């Protein structure tokens, strides 16, 4: 057992002790959001504020360091910043979970495992993506190198999910394999983070740059966090693309903290601190790789290109979905020249993009947050307290 697995084992034991300690706590009409991404939480908080008068419960947000940008949304709701490595933070967070009849989370949190033997609290997983091009959970290829104790711990967390929200039947199939869940656990409410793409507001960021916008939003490589590759150089933007485009780069938070050298220039800007949905709305073109961002951007029916310079390596080390190249709405381009060929010489296939979006966003209709909050309301009313 490596050091990381050993730490996780002690972490799990500590959580189990807290679970026993707080078992007598009776839940109230309270909904807790446990989040490490801002997108779903932002949508749910805004919807809650808009419909609070018709809902019987209060909301508390537990957020980690990757979701600190949520602070501006938290007025009017309870909140607590959780350092997952701080024992007292964990103690308070678990107590808040136990005081709630409904918990909604957006990621893998070991602390939800304490809810496994707590039928009076419903745990709903909304996940942080409305589609997936890479394998995760029980399907993750790195599991083959992990000790059995790790896999057992993962399953313990997945068993804490009473329900998982889905935006499509395609993603439902992914979740069933990745989390080991059944059809009866699937909530076809759509995915809250997609609601914003149905709002008819003009892109707020469009005026910031005088040129057309290419947004580059790559996923992270957990086996190489210190480097990333840009799809175009300043010279290519100037000459091959006639200086018509700005290249905006949105890096994953996990990568950003490892990148020290600046890559910015006149036509290349780092926009990693800006909200994804604002950038997607402003962008004319998206370039990505194995990220889940295309599933959101497809709702806007604009061109997507795939810069997959390390496709074979990524598939071997991290694991892509089966038939990746036939699933994506476009060609997998191994270098900048292939990207330029696709961008400058191939017409945009709007119908193909719409089919892709319809397949992966079939239940996301712009009202997913409201639908999920209404479902939580029914669980509040039907929640029976565990016997003493």
Residue ranges with predicted function:
Residues 1-91:
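N-terminal pre-catalytic "stem/leader" segment of glycosyltransferase-like enzymes
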Residues 2-20, 133-135, 139-225, 253-256, ...:
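A nucleotide-sugar donor-handling region in carbohydrate enzymes
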Residues 39-52, 177-178, 186-261, 333, ...:
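Conserved catalytic-core segment of nucleotide-activated headgroup transferases in glycan assembly
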Residues 82-98, 253-295:
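Donor nucleotide-activated moiety binding/catalytic core segment of transferases
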Residues 102-109, 114-116, 124-127, 274-318:
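A donor-sugar binding/catalytic signature common to diverse glycosyltransferases
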Residues 103-104, 162-168, 248, 286-287:
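A short beta-strand/loop micro-motif in the catalytic core of glycosyltransferases
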Residues 292-360:
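Catalytic binding pocket for nucleotide-activated donors in carbohydrate/polymer assembly enzymes
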């Amino acid at each position: 057992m490596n050091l990381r697995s050993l730490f996780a084992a002690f972490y799990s034991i500590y959580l189990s002790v807290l679970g026993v300690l707080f078992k007598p706590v009776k839940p109230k009409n309270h909904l807790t959001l446990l989040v490490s991404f801002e997108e779903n939480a932002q949508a749910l908080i805004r919807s809650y504020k808009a419909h609070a008068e018709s809902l019987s419960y209060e909301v508390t947000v537990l957020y980690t360091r990757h979701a600190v940008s949520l602070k501006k949304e938290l007025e009017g709701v309870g909140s607590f910043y959780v350092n997952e490595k701080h024992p007292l933070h964990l103690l308070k967070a678990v107590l808040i979970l136990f005081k709630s009849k409904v918990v909604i989370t957006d990621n893998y949190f070991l602390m939800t495992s304490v809810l496994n033997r707590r039928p009076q609290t419903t745990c709903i997983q909304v996940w942080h993506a409305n589609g997936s091009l890479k394998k995760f959970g029980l399907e993750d290829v790195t599991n083959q190198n992990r000790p059995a104790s790790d896999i057992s711990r993962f399953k313990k967390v997945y068993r804490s999910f009473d329900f998982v929200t889905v935006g499509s039947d395609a993603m439902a199939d992914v979740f069933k394999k990745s989390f080991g869940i059944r059809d009866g656990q699937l909530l076809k409410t759509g995915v809250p983070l997609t609601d914003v793409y149905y709002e008819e507001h003009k892109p707020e960021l469009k005026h910031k740059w005088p040129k057309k916008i290419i947004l580059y939003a790559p996923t992270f490589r957990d086996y190489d966090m210190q480097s990333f590759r840009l799809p175009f150089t300043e010279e290519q933007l100037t000459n091959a693309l006639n200086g018509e485009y700005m290249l905006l780069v949105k890096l994953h938070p996990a990568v950003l903290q490892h990148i020290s050298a600046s890559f910015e220039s006149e036509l290349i800007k780092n926009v990693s601190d800006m909200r994804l949905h604002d950038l997607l709305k402003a962008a004319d073109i998206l370039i990505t790789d194995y990220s889940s961002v295309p599933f959101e951007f497809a709702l806007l029916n604009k061109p997507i290109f795939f810069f997959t310079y390390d496709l074979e390596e990524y598939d071997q080390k991290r694991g892509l979905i089966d038939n990746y190249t036939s699933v994506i709405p476009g060609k997998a381009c191994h270098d900048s020249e292939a990207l330029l060929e696709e961008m400058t010489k191939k017409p945009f296939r709007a119908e193909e993009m719409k089919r892709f979006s319809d397949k992966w966003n079939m239940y996301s209709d712009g009202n997913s947050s409201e639908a999920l909050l209404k479902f939580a309301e029914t669980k509040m009313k039907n929640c029976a307290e565990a016997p003493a």
